[in-house]
Structures are given as C-alpha cells and as structure tokens.
Amino acid sequence: MQKKSIYVAYTGGTIGMQRSEQGYIPVSGHLQRQLALMPEFHRPEMPDFTIHEYTPLMDSSDMTPEDWQHIAEDIKAHYDDYDGFVILHGTDTMAYTASALSFMLENLGKPVIVTGSQIPLAELRSDGQINLLNALYVAANYPINEVTLFFNNRLYRGNRTTKAHADGFDAFASPNLPPLLEAGIHIRRLNTPPAPHGEGELIVHPITPQPIGVVTIYPGISADVVRNFLRQPVKALILRSYGVGNAPQNKAFLQELQEASDRGIVVVNLTQCMSGKVNMGGYATGNALAHAGVIGGADMTVEATLTKLHYLLSQELDTETIRKAMSQNLRGELTPDD
C-alpha cells in the first residue's frame, strides 16, 4: 500500500522558533533541522511529508487577510499532488486563520489541519512534537475533509475554535461544538455533526481586507462610542452583547444601529458568553436590537464571524444577501435552529 503524502505549509509561529538574547525568534531552516533529529517522524507508520517554509516566517500576530489568501492559494497549487495538508501557524491568530480557510475553501475533498505549539519544538517539554506528529498521522489515516485545528490531542472544526488559554497546553476551546476526534491511547472519531459539504472541484474564494468593527457592550456604553465605530468606511460591525443577545435600550444607542443598518452596514449580534447562542426574541432588550436591523449571530465565535464577514464582503454581494448568509450554516460554523 502506497504511503500517504502530506504537504506542510510552515507559515511561522512558536513551533519553529529558536532562543536568542532577545527572546524566541523565527529562524529559517531551524524547524527542519529539529525534525531530522526526531526519529518518530520518520517511522514507517508515518506518512511522507514535504515542508514548504514561507518567506518570511511570520509571528501570527502579523497575520492579515492577504496571508490567508496566500495559504489558500498554496493549498490550491498543490492540491492534486498530496493527500492532505498541515498548516504550521502561531497560536495567537490560529483560530482566525482556520476559520478564514474554512470559508475560502469550498468543496474541500482533503483534510486541512492547522496546528502549532506553545513551546518551540527544540525546547524541553515542547508540545510541538505531539501536535505535529498527530496532525500528520491523523491527516493521513483519519482524514476529515474540512479545515480543522489540532491541539492537545483534540481535533476541532476550525471555525468553531477560539484561543482560550494564553500559556497552557490546552490552548484552544470549541465552546459550542464537541471535538471531531480525540487522540488518546486510541484515536477516536466522535459523532459530531458534519459540516455542510458541496460536490465538485475545489473552489478557492478570494478574501480581501475589509473594514469591520468589533464593539463589546459594557454598562454605561454611550451612543458616541458606537457612532465612532460606525464611521465610514466601516462595512460591518460585530456587537458583543450580554447573555442571549441583550443590550441597553438607550434610544440614541439604538438609533445609531438603525441608521447604520439603513446605510447598508451589516451589524451582527454575538454573545459575550463563552458558550451558548444569541436569541434576540427572548427579551425586550434583544428584540429592540432586531428592530434596529441587527442580525443574530447564533453561536458563532468572534473569529468565525469576523472571517465570514471578510469572506462575504469580498464576494461583491449586495447587503441583503450578506445579511441572509450570516444566518446560514455555510461551513459548519453555527448550529441551525431546530
């Protein structure tokens, strides 16, 4: 039986960094040298893999929509030559990149796993070894044909993840959807609902930078704060509200949202809570937002909502189509109402 072959896109991040007097820094070729010294990556059970190092290597804090586009085009260029793809990435914006790729890559017929580490691969107690080893093995032997994120022995749907711990190995959470797979003594696929999946050739949708605001509601927030966020050229606003989607019933505040909606700005309501979903019909305060033209974001993460808006705004769709699509389950990013 022919061995599977996995393409590794090494964008940067902690996993390949080297210690210096200024702290950890990315060094070209360092990751590859470390992997050559680790025999477990070259056991016969492991797939073949090719590492493509990006130039320059990036700290994920510098990641932009142009970089998401570059990664997606890289996957497209090598799509027919490999059985799966692993993206090595810094943890700070990993959930954003995984979410963005999920929307950009339509009709995905091969696994794309995003992973990295909290401690560099070359350092004692690095989590990079087990994360990368498992990502390669799972991509080859337990393929799930969507964009996923592997960290600390769990494989998550990428657009359901958020970074939940700044310095722990259990760095990522999927608050509203169980993992797709767990890698313990045995590797187990879980009965997690599948994402919607189309048929046909892989389509890579473009993403371009879009002016999107994010506002967290807090006690005493003024209409002026919201007004400043809604100034041109903003095309969309994510409103992080209380509980199931509640916000102050301040008339000036609601008027700003109504006027923004009338101007064609897409306003999406997300809960500040770690888990659960928005239901703007549950309380009068949430209902007032709906009457002001605000769309409910269901149980999407901020990362999924932001990248979904980037994706839709990049397609030159009219405002009403974008509003409808924000409430639709395109890539498994939200839980539809029963």
UniProtKB/Swiss-Prot annotation:
Subcellular location per UniProt equals: Cytoplasm
- Chain coiled-coil ranges: none
Q: Which UniProt keywords apply?
A: Allosteric enzyme, Cytoplasm, Hydrolase
Activity regulation comment: Shows cooperative activation. Allosterically activated by asparagine.
> Which GO CC annotations does the UniProt entry carry?
cytoplasm; cytosol
Q: Which GO terms describe its molecular function?
A: asparaginase activity; identical protein binding
In the record, the note on similarity to other proteins reads: Belongs to the asparaginase 1 family.
SUPFAM superfamilies listed in its UniProt record: Glutaminase/Asparaginase
Principal EC category: hydrolase
InterPro entries for this protein: AsnA_fam, Asp/glu_Ase-like_sf, Asparaginase/glutaminase-like, Asparaginase/glutaminase_AS1, Asparaginase/glutaminase_AS2, Asparaginase_C, L-asparaginase_C, L-asparaginase_I
PANTHER family in UniProt: 60 KDA LYSOPHOSPHOLIPASE, L-ASPARAGINASE
Q: What is this protein called?
A: L-asparaginase 1
EC no. given is: 3.5.1.1
Asparaginase/glutaminase domain residues? 4-329
One GO-annotated biological process of the protein: protein homotetramerization
Changing residue 61 to Q: what effect?
Loss of enzyme activity
Q: What is the effect of changing residue 162 to A?
A: No effect on activity at saturating substrate concentration. Abolishes cooperativity
Q: Specify which residues bind L-asparagine 1 according to the UniProt entry for this protein.
A: 59-61, 91-92
- From the UniProt record, report the name of the gene that encodes this protein: ansA
Give the reactions, separated by semicolons, that this protein catalyses. L-asparagine + H2O = L-aspartate + NH4(+)
The record's Pfam families line, in alphabetical order, gives: Asparaginase, Asparaginase_C
Q: Which organism is it from?
A: Escherichia coli (strain K12)
The record's misc note reads:
E.coli contains two L-asparaginase isoenzymes: L-asparaginase I, a low-affinity enzyme located in the cytoplasm, and L-asparaginase II, a high-affinity secreted enzyme.
